Amino acid sequence: MLYVTTRNKSDAHTAHKTLTTDRGPCGGFYAPFQMPSFGKSDIEALKGKNFGQCVADILNIFFNARLDGWDVDFSIGRYPCRIVSMSRKVLVAETWHNPDWDFARMVRNLSGCIRGNDEAGGVPSDWAWMSIRIATLFGLFGELLRLGVADTEQPIDIAVTTGDFSAPMAAWYARKMGLPIGNIVFSCNENCAVWDLFHHGQMRTDMIATTTNTPDCDVAIPAALERLIYAQLGADEVKRYLDACTNGLEYRLDDDKLAQLRKGFFSAVVSQKRMESVIHNVYRTSTYLLDPYSALAYGGLQDYRSGSGEGRNALLITERSPACFAETVAKAMGITVQEMKERTRMN
C-alpha cells in the first residue's frame, strides 16, 4: 500500500516509511493513498475468524506484513481483548488484557511483529498506532457479530475519549472501511477546544492545557484532528488550519464545512468531578469498575443518548485497567486503594 500525507497528496510513501517515522518530510501525518473498503459479505465473514486473524488481515493490507492469526496470537495472546456487558445496550471492550494491563503493550508487541522483530523493542510510529487501533476494531466487531449484538444492517455506536484524537479517528477510518459503526462519541475533560469546534464552529489555537487527573486528555489542540480535517475537508483546509495554529489565531469553519466535519460524531465534555461520580455510580448500579478515561467516555455516551434519544447498542472502548489508576478510582469510590485492588481482582 502507498501512502500520502495530510499536507502533501502528490508524493507517495512506502508502508515501511510509515513504520519508521511519525510524519512525512512535509510534517504531515501518513494516510493511505486509497483507503481499503469492505462490503457486507466481507464484514459478515469476520464472524468466522478469531480475533488474531481479523487483526492480521487488516495489518497485512496496510503493511503487506504476511501475518497470520497465529503470529498475532503469539505476539499478544489469544484473548487480549474481552467484551463485557456493563448495562442495558452498553458493552465494554477491554483491550488491556496483558501483563501491563495496558493497550499500549499490545501496540508495542504488534508493531514489532509487523516490523519482523522478535521482541517488542522501539517506539511504535503514529501510523502503527492508528492501524493497530483500526485492526483491533475489526477484531472486536468479529466478536460482536458472533455474540449477535451487531450486524451489517444495524450499526453500533462507539464511545471513546478524545486524547490526541487518535481513538475517534481510528473509529472513523474503520467506519469508512465498512464496519457498521453508527455515531462516534468522543469525550473531552476540561481541555475542550475540540468540543468548541464541533459545537460552535470555532476553536482557539493558543490555549494552554489544564492539568487534570486524566493527563492523556490534557491536550490543548489534539494532533490527529489534522487527520479528520484532511479526510473530511481536504488538503487546502488543512493548510488554513495549520496557518491558524502557527499564528495562534482562532480557527473558524462556516456552517457547511462544520456540518461535514462533524458528520457521524458527537462531542461531549465531562468534568473531573463528574468523571469521579460516574465511576462511583456505575459500580453501584452495575458492579462494573470503570477507569477514569472510560468514565469520561461513558459520561459522554450518556449525554449523547439523553440528547438524541438514541438507544441502539454502544461499545465503550477501554485501553487500561482500573488498577492502573488505583488512587483516582479509590477516591471516586470512597474506599482505600487496597479495597479497590481487591475489587479489581474480583472483576
Residue ranges and their predicted role:
Residues 1-347:
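PLP-dependent amino-acid enzyme catalytic core
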